[in-house]
Amino acid sequence: MASLPARRIRNFSIIAHIDHGKSTLADTLLMRTKTVKERDMVKQVLDSMDLERERGITIKLNSARMDYVASDGELYVLNLIDTPGHVDFSYEVSRSLAACEGALLVVDSSQGVEAQTVANVYLALENDLEIFTVLNKIDLAGSEPDRVKQEIEDVLGLDASDAILASAKANIGMDDILERIVQVVPPPRDTANEPLRALIFDSYFDPYRGVVAVFRVMDGTMKTGDAMKMMATGATFAADEIGIMRPDKVPVKELGPGEVGYIIGGIKSVADARVGDTITLSKNPAAEALPGYSKSVPMVFAGIFPTDTDRYDDLRESLQRLQINDCSLSFEPEQNSAMGTGFRCGFLGLLHMEIIQERLEREYDLDLITTAPSVVYNVYRTDGTMDSISNPADLCPPELRERIEEPYCRLDMIAPSDYVGTLMELASQRRGEFIDMTYLSETRTSIKYDIPLAEVVTNYFDDMKSRSRGYASMEYAITGYRQSDLVRLDVLINQEPADPLAVITHRDRAYSIGRQLVDKLKELIPRQMFRIPIQAAIGNKVIAATSISAMRKDVTAKCYGGDISRKKKLLKKQAAGKKRMKQFGKVEVPQDAFLAVLSVDGAAD
């Protein structure tokens, strides 16, 4: 199969918020162009993981090639490059968009513009994509196309007057969308004579064939059997097989400029074929790589421990397998007095963390305990060195540190105007700094805050949803590090520090968090034969304390009357025994106490 002339290729992606109908629209387009036969159709055909189909989100990217005969009688190839919609995967989104020339902005005509839509549209504009609007779910009773068109123009500054009214479910407007793709999306430049440069926008591990890299040819031509080289990682390999996705793989001999395909060449690890890297020929390499490549850096860390310590090796093996497919996941062994042995894992964000945990439990049948998520702090020492830490136990003593910096992010919440007050209160409680408020329409508002990432990763999303009755949506982007007055809050149980319960928090919030911690532990730790003091302390200074009173055995029960000195002797002996027990007694803290403490959200009382 010869490669197609570039003027007949259209590369596009679909931008949408979760639940606005992106996957259903993709399914309908695949059926409309007869790329997928109706009998082979599964819902959300491009979402290959069960987890994606259940949650209705796109995690891993997929792409599909459709053949379409337009109204001008010409055959066009439409490459749909799917993008994940969630902020945790924004780097993957940006690389997918870099492989396109155009984008469909899909907005639910009953809901309107949401936070993630805004973020992804800005990414598309940064990549100079031609954007046109599709108002989906037009068949619903609550559909308000005129209001939503106005909102798109006001919020995003895009002309929505010629937006296509469609319903992917009811098959309305699909031909209009296909025609608009051909007319509006620019064809790729014809650069067949230049040295090969292909942009990897996805890669995954196939247990039988090694790493499969999905790419778009930017310049030059790729042929089966060519010796290839990755420009960022330097890995070299032979192109054993190249092909196109319909969405299943179909091998071809060569791919020209603008075409989208996959390559298999015995690559052993996804780390050698990273998203954003450039493929070129070993013999005739390109002078420079395509711009925009960066290594994904974990922003959120948490400890993952097996409930059964015998399954530690299974957990390690499962994490290694997931890492083959997901090089943004990092992990290292961690020993913990309460949980035993496990791993300290790094994730791109909270959704990434939830997905990894759920995949470990579901695909590898593991029972896991996950500790509270934390972020990476930069600790500057007095001797001029800098440590990046994510575990409170690694924080050096106050006399050795000059300052601590924590990551901040720009948070954008979009919500009905009725909930603005309560959402602003939540953001201020979480140390947010108000930046801007915009009325998107009479009923919907966008509120922007600069807020520490540590506050966002601890239950912020749940609190926002409960305060707005589920109507608010949010998006955040890391803006950099700032100096903060942070302290390490230790918990002492019977004078012994309980390391797993230590947290890094802001000094102003330390008292309320300490108070919540000690009160919660008092409820959960079983009573002993001696009094157990529970304290929250910063360094040597106790800021909150409580105690669990001792259980008392009635040692005088057998003395019926008789001499009082006998009772005194027994009570004295009991007191001495308790004193000795307090000195040598160990307090066993149950695991559910640790888990319950993880739910302390630290919102100021």
From Swiss-Prot:
The keyword Chloroplast applies. Its EC number is 3.6.5.-. It catalyses: GTP + H2O = GDP + phosphate + H(+). It is an enzyme of class 3 (hydrolase). Pfam families: EFG_C, GTP_EFTU, GTP_EFTU_D2, LepA_C. GTP binds at residues 16-23, 82-86, 136-139. GO terms for biological process: positive regulation of translation; translation. One of its GO terms (molecular function) is GTP binding. Keywords: Chloroplast, GTP-binding, Hydrolase, Nucleotide-binding, Plastid, Protein biosynthesis. Residues 7-189 form the tr-type G domain. Its main location: plastid. It is found in: Plastid, Chloroplast. The keyword Oxidoreductase does not apply. GO terms for cellular component: chloroplast. Promotes chloroplast protein synthesis. May act as a fidelity factor of the translation reaction, by catalyzing a one-codon backward translocation of tRNAs on improperly translocated ribosomes. This protein may be expected to contain an N-terminal transit peptide but none has been predicted. Belongs to the TRAFAC class translation factor GTPase superfamily. Classic translation factor GTPase family. LepA subfamily. This is Translation factor GUF1 homolog, chloroplastic.
